[in-house]
Amino acid sequence: MRAPALAVFLVVALSVSARAQAPYPTLDQEPACQTLTPAAAGGPLPKNPDVLVVRFLGVSNYELTYRNTVVLLDAAIDKLSWWAPNHLTPDEMTRHVDAIFIGHAHGEHLWDAPLIGEKTGARVVGDPIAMGWVRSTGRIADAKISVVKGLGGETFAFNGFSVEAVQGHHNVVPNDYMAKDRAAAQAITLGGPLTPDEQDHDKRLNSMVPLTTDERERLITDGTIAYYLAFDNGFKAFYTDSAGPTTAAEKALMQKAGRVDLGFIPYYGGEMAIPITMEYVRLFKPSVVLPTHHDGHRSRMLDMPTGPLNLAIRAELPAAKAIAPLLRTPVCINTVTKELYVGN
């Protein structure tokens, strides 16, 4: 009886050893971490099933790739002329998308969702206001539209992780501050005024997602959705695209979750934004911080450098890594070992 038992032991031991020595590349050799091409545009998926690849695409738009799943957090690939170009077109981002999660119904967060969803068959998730507009385009089948309110029980399962909708809050920046900021940016701009073609381009984009006065008001408190990502191996992430005050739903979530490994944390409004952004940092205690809605504008608003914010994060969470990645740069995290790699 001992020989068969020994044989079984050896088979199990060899199997475990083979898994431990699986020929996965290190992060600095992982193909998905060495390219600027998003997976949605035909770039490679990570070879290591434990590796998460994240790319900033502008404003609050991020691509998240894990195993065979490609998710867009917000979907506005086309950019207004006063944002730095990401050198991508909406059509290019239709090679592989499994789901689109929309934060709220302002155009720069969702105006390309119908096109991308139609061409990829991706599920499109968002609040009632955002999904009302998406449905009105007639490009997405009702079966692929998921309307959420973020009040619990709205979870979407993928290969190795799930995404839960959580009620958020849109940022509230005083009008007089915004007026002064725009005037200052206009006064010191080095890029010159927008060309007629740029003005036409921006007019088209700005008119794509019309909202009523009632919708604009409801969007602030009821129409902003954050998302909690729970991985099967225990890795946790949180995404929100607007820097409003933290909500009861977000606080209830963190009473259960404790802290997150990766936080997509909102930063909008320059120096005024640091206190509210730090409210998110204190609540979620992320090990890695990636900002949302932080990129600067030409002839519209003053730049919002993340240096002062990152210093505040370091002062309270010295072990946290606060990163403001360049457009399309791969940020790779091994969700088991927590190793972090930032590409070029």
Language-model regions, residue ranges each:
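Active-site-proximal loop/helix segments of hydrolase catalytic cores
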Residues: 84-85, 203-283
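Active-site environment of divalent metal-dependent phosphoester hydrolases
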Residues: 80, 106-111, 131-134, 152-154, ...
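Flexible, acidic/histidine-containing loops and adjacent segments that form or flank the divalent-metal
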Residues: 27, 147-226, 232-235, 321-344
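Bacterial N-terminal signal peptides
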Residues: 5-15
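Boundary at the C-terminal end of the N-terminal hydrophobic targeting segment
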Residues: 18-22
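Active-site neighborhood of phospho(di)ester-bond hydrolases with catalytic His/Asp-centered motifs
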Residues: 59, 72-76, 96-106, 125-128, ...
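Binuclear metal-ion centers of metallo-dependent hydrolases, dominated by the metallo-beta-lactamase
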Residues: 131, 136-159, 278, 282-344
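Pre-active-site segment of Zn-dependent metallo-hydrolases
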Residues: 33-49, 57, 61-106, 111-118, ...
